A protein has these predicted regions:
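Catalytic or ion-coupling anion/metal-binding cores of large enzyme and transporter domains
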Residues: 1-54, 59-80, 85-86, 91-96, ...
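A short, small-residue-rich loop immediately preceding and capping a beta-strand
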Residues: 111-132, 144-147
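Glycine-rich, highly charged phosphate/nucleotide-binding loops
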Residues: 96-105
């Protein structure tokens, strides 16, 4: 009789014809009993490329042990990672968003190719998180995501954004070389993902809210007993999911994605969450659009006073209880759907039932009557500069509107050099284009320019718009994901120096002061300003990637 717990591995190892397969597996440690067990793949993103992932092999070992102890046979395999923090501001950053697709494709390929019945995915650096979940949703086999964990604070509560902003301070002459080197040497003390509510911590929190991580997985330091235990529990959880036939399609829904968006907003999370949640929803067959972020954002406040716009680090949020008490606050306020299923086999409300509130003395997560911002910091803007939408991150500290004069650059490097050379005046709207998914290719993050702006003391005096992305560490008056992008003839590619641009975060508008006849005249003479690769992964990506307004996916319609 067929073992219903082994719908995929049985095809690989059962019967006379699969004798060669069993022979191969014996060489990697299988014994007679292992062939009777469900096989669980452990997808590790370990790499010495980045501190975000340097410890994940050990975490994979703990996940393997947890799965084996629960009665499965676990098999560890690896995939790649690209370090955003290291490649930022260089041509290598073009490969960052591309790596999301490569990681997703490779996990799907390994799990489906080897016939694993379930999977634990473990991610550290930014693109790991959405990539792992996208693969889980494509495969639709019992699976749990484990976050590799956040880094400990550096000296004087420094983190990677401290280093980027120190570059701008050095260029402005407000610090000297010795002070810059001191920041460089003390900001990153060891393993773990970047320490504010940047993209990695944002996405880990979103995935926990989505129901595909165990409770508290998003709020544990990388080097901690809690994180090791999380991995062991994840291995066992996948075995339980196999036994009760609980799959991602039983967990993810429009309601669960609304929960994820709600938590991202309450935490003041990264603009990258918009791009990644759209992509994840596409892989799960869920109808999610940019406008859903606006609808939810009208009712959900920002409650967490965390970096980059706030004061506190993720490690400090962990100390007071992580995001589970916040989620319970949101549930009790009627802002979360409590009846959605999670990977524990229980509903969200059941998972949160016994969660204790934050200590009364803490001021990291605020009460609803004293929010950091009364509505969402993530704004979806439309207008003649962004007919298909753009994404802004508006904390309110930089104001709610900006009107200025365009200064156009056709690459990140051109803009960064102008900022560092002191050539950007107050009242300027810096336009960085041809950095979209197709135009980059790869949709680079603009952390170097935004950090240089902040370091130069121009954070409240200039704005930046781009068809590229922003790091979760970016803050200031910044608008990204402008669509259509310049490379496909979008209006951002028609701008000229001196054009007047208006950004209105209250009206959710992004516009240039030009009538349609002038835009049509410019469009008629527009030509692509840069060459795109003709070979290799960037060429394949540019040919297949969708608009950022649809998640920049490569397997869509």
């Amino acid at each position: 009789m067929t073992d219903k717990r082994r719908p995929y591995s049985s095809v690989i190892v059962d019967g006379l014809a699969q004798t060669p397969s069993r022979a191969m597996l014996r060489a990697v440690g299988f014994d007679d009993e292992d062939f009777k067990k469900p096989q669980i793949g452990i997808a590790s993103t370990w790499s010495m490329v980045t501190p975000c992932n340097m410890h994940i092999n050990e975490l994979a070992d703990h996940a393997e042990a947890g799965a084996n102890a629960a009665g499965a046979k676990a098999v560890v395999f690896n995939t790649i990672t690209v370090s955003d923090g290291i490649s930022m501001g260089t041509p290598g950053m073009r490969y960052s968003l591309v790596s999301r697709e490569v990681i997703c494709d490779s996990i799907e390929t390994a799990v489906a190719g080897q016939g694993f019945d379930g999977v634990v995915t473990i991610g550290g650096c930014d693109k790991n998180m959405p990539a792992c979940v996208m693969a889980m949703l494509r495969l639709n086999r019992p699976s749990v995501f484990v976050y590799g964990g956040t880094i400990k604070p550096g000296a004087e509560r420094r983190d990677i954004v401290s280093v980027f902003e120190a570059v701008g301070q050095r260029a402005a002459g407000t610090i000297d070389d010795s002070q810059l080197i001191a920041v460089e040497k003390t900001a990153i003390p060891g393993p773990g993902s970047c320490g504010g509510m940047y993209t990695a911590n944002t996405m880990a929190s979103a995935i926990e809210a989505l129901g595909l991580s165990l409770p508290n997985s998003s709020a544990q330091e990388a080097v901690s007993g809690d994180k090791k235990e999380d991995c062991e529990r994840a291995g066992a959880a996948v075995m339980r999911m196999i036994e009760i036939d609980l799959k991602p399609s039983d967990i993810v829904s429009k309601k669960s994605f609304e929960n994820a968006i709600t938590v991202v907003i309450a935490l003041g999370g990264s603009t990258n969450a918009v791009l990644h949640l759209l992509a994840m929803a596409q892989c799960g067959g869920i109808d999610l659009t940019l406008d859903d972020f606006t609808t939810i954002g009208q009712r959900v406040p920002v409650l967490a006073d965390v970096k980059p716009s706030g004061r506190y680090l993720m490690s400090e949020l962990i100390e007071i209880g992580g995001i589970q008490p916040l989620m319970k606050m949101l549930l009790e306020r009627g802002l979360l759907h409590g009846n959605v299923m999670t990977c524990t086999g229980q509903t969200m409300a059941e998972n949160l039932a016994d969660v204790q509130p934050y200590p009364e003395s803490q001021d990291i997560v605020r009460a609803f009557d004293n929010p950091v911002k009364k509505d969402s910091h993530l704004r979806i803007l439309y207008g003649n500069l962004a007919p298909e939408g753009a994404v802004a991150k508006i904390s309110g500290k930089e104001g709610l509107s900006f009107k200025g004069t365009a200064r156009c650059f056709n690459s990140e490097e051109e803009a960064l050099n102008a900022i560092l050379d002191g050539k950007i005046e107050k009242g300027t709207v810096i336009v960085i284009r041809y950095e979209g998914p197709k135009g980059g290719p790869g949709m680079r993050e603009m952390l170097s320019p935004t950090s240089a702006i902040m370091g130069a003391g121009l954070g409240k005096d200039v704005a930046l718009i781009t068809d590229g992305r922003f790091s979760g560490g970016s803050h200031g008056f910044v608008i990204g994901h402008v669509t259509p992008e310049a490379a496909v003839g979008g209006p951002i590619g028609l701008l000229e120096d001196g054009d007047t641009i208006t950004i209105d975060a209250e009206a959710n508008a992004l516009a240039v002061d030009l009538d349609e006849s002038e835009l049509s005249r410019r469009r008629a003479s527009w030509q692509m300003e840069k060459e795109t690769p003709s070979r290799g992964v960037l060429a394949k990506y540019a040919r297949s990637v969708s608009s950022a307004s649809r998640g920049a996916v490569t397997d869509g319609d």
